[in-house]
């Protein structure tokens, strides 16, 4: 069977693996799977977005499914529109933080949660079978256009409130967030300074929000004496934050801060994160009545655990946050509003960040052909159990071993031909010692696979 979906939908180089033909067949497969109904479709700013969107919509229509085309839309707006219009599914044409030559297809459930791997497997099986539903001439689906931005803003303002006004610099990265994120901040009463705010498929900066890609945002925050800088990737499902001193706030720190604020705002509860998240989150939220649950990497796994356990907040140490009181779609735009509310209630991020415990985190990528990943992971798991003196093992996504003052995660990438090593320790010396040992173990495992 063909494997089209990865850890975050389909994501490939356009007109190589991701073609209009594949987009057409995904539309046909989704329509066949649904057996009718209505699907919301939106896309980010990539140059290939219109081509792929039209092909996908054609596939949906051919099965008798109606389409609500919301045009250029960040992923959070697509998730919101699914619930707003009572649709049976949603599709975003996006490659999120990948470079311009990539695009992707991500499918969403009626509750705003991404399709699970099991659901994606069913779509793949339909594509491979070629057994698509074909509507009669008088039952072919219809398309209507819609613009849910005003409703999104109105609903967001019912949940988030500020007592004061702040200066906010927003770097939308030329992505789809530029049509919504600055406007939400303005509606909250803030003074907004926009960077890279014109929608374009020719991205000015690297789309993944990190210290390097947000150097201009950091300089602008400092020069304008702004209270905070907020950045998004291509579809604005992620958020990156620069504090009032012009410093990029590490993902682990922001994850801890916003989880703590959610506990203060909504009361004690469970916080869901992924196996690659460090100890800081546990240590920071425990005194606030928070309990950490870890799951597989990916927003769909986080959303699934939130729904199962009635969690109060979910997030990954990549700037992907899910606020279940709002939606089960990762939403960097609404997250930005919550960051401002946190500042309004608790004070500057530069001061709040001092309260979050700091550990030494190291990451490594080891080249590994996709065909070797499964066998290499078997060897890694076996050897890691023998080589490290650990107290706890978590194997829900890769292999994570923990001791009292360190942890290591061995995990194959779901989107690249690499093995990832992530580790954390209390001291730099210990972290380097662990990484040296871990890298040697992984390279030997790949050679033997």
UniProtKB/Swiss-Prot annotation:
It comes from the Archaea. The keyword Zinc does not apply. It comes from Thermococcus onnurineus (strain NA1). Catalyzes the conversion of glucosamine-6-phosphate to glucosamine-1-phosphate. The modification Phosphoserine is found at residue 96. Keywords: Isomerase, Magnesium, Metal-binding, Phosphoprotein. This is Probable phosphoglucosamine mutase. The lineage of its organism: Archaea, Methanobacteriati, Methanobacteriota, Thermococci, Thermococcales. It catalyses: alpha-D-glucosamine 1-phosphate = D-glucosamine 6-phosphate. Activated by phosphorylation.
